[in-house]
Design a protein with these regions (language model features):
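Metallo-beta-lactamase
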Residues: 18-28, 61-63, 69-71, 121-170, 172-228, ...
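Sec-dependent signal peptide recognition
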Residues: 1-7
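Active-site HxH/HxHxD metal-binding segment of metal-dependent hydrolases
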Residues: 72-75, 79-158
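N-terminal signal peptide c-region/cleavage motif recognized by signal peptidases
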Residues: 12-14
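Solvent-exposed, acidic/flexible segments
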Residues: 45-49, 67-74, 98-101, 116, ...
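Solvent-exposed loop/turn segments at secondary-structure junctions
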Residues: 39-42, 62, 69-72, 97-101, ...
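Conserved beta-strand hairpin/beta-sheet module of binuclear metal-dependent hydrolase folds
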Residues: 27-80, 180-192
Length: 228
């Protein structure tokens, strides 16, 4: 029995060591980095990392756009940010309630986390079920992950961090409550999942394609230069 337990331990250690998201920030504009997820479905291979997250390094501190699919991802995101700047994270903005965008919130429990009111309501209503489903699909990557509802409620308008005025835009076409963030200094537009590239749309929470198309037309009209 002792030999069997030792063997199981040796088998499990490499498996745990492989649970590394290996996040690599890519600079897309001044003070702005993106961490690109895979163009895949959820799997035990990718750990749910099929999301594009990002962060802006302002004079006031770092603003994070989406926290990712798990506590482990959120922790890796904080480490990646620390590799770019020694400024603290001062704000997390969640674009919508889907699990790959909001289940990393625990890693930022010491930071103000904000979302649209509809996103907060959806996370409170559906978050546990979404997390449980992701646990089934990606396994141990999700260890310790629990739903953390954003404490702050966002309204459309402009919030400024240092020299970066961020225009907060509220839509609904993808999830029923979708935040897009336009940095008016750099022209970077974080569109969340309102935009898909070479992937089928995910529509279980969409109010309808007509609304989604209208949202896309409004996004297209924004003065963006880089689209995330």
């Amino acid at each position: 029995m002792r030999a069997l337990l030792c063997l199981l331990s040796l088998v499990s250690l490499p498996a745990l060591a492989d649970l590394d998201y290996r996040l690599e920030p890519r600079q897309v504009a001044a003070d702005t980095w993106v961490l690109e997820g895979r163009s895949e479905n959820f799997s035990r291979d990718n750990g749910g990392n099929i999301v594009n997250t990002g962060f802006i390094v302002s004079e006031d501190g770092v603003v994070v756009i989406d926290s990712g699919p798990s506590l482990r991802y959120g922790q890796a995101l904080r480490q990646a940010i620390a590799g770019v700047t020694d400024k603290p994270v001062v704000q997390v903005l969640i674009t919508h309630h889907h699990p790959d965008h909001a289940l990393g919130n625990q890693a930022f429990a010491d930071v103000p986390i904000a979302a649209l009111s509809g996103t907060k309501e959806q996370l409170a209503r559906e978050g546990d079920a979404l997390a449980e489903n992701l646990y089934r699909m990606v396994g141990d990557w999700m260890r310790g992950t629990q739903v953390l509802i954003p404490a702050q409620t966002l309204q459309p308008g402009v919030r400024t961090f240092g020299s970066h005025p961020l225009r907060l835009l509220a839509f609904s076409g993808h999830s029923g409550a979708d935040l897009a963030v336009l940095d008016e200094k750099t022209g970077v537009l974080f569109a969340g999942d309102l935009l898909f590239y070479q992937r089928a749309l995910t529509t279980p929470h969409s109010p309808g394609l007509a609304q989604w198309v209208d949202d896309l037309q409004q996004l297209q009209a924004q003065p963006w230069t880089v689209l995330v």
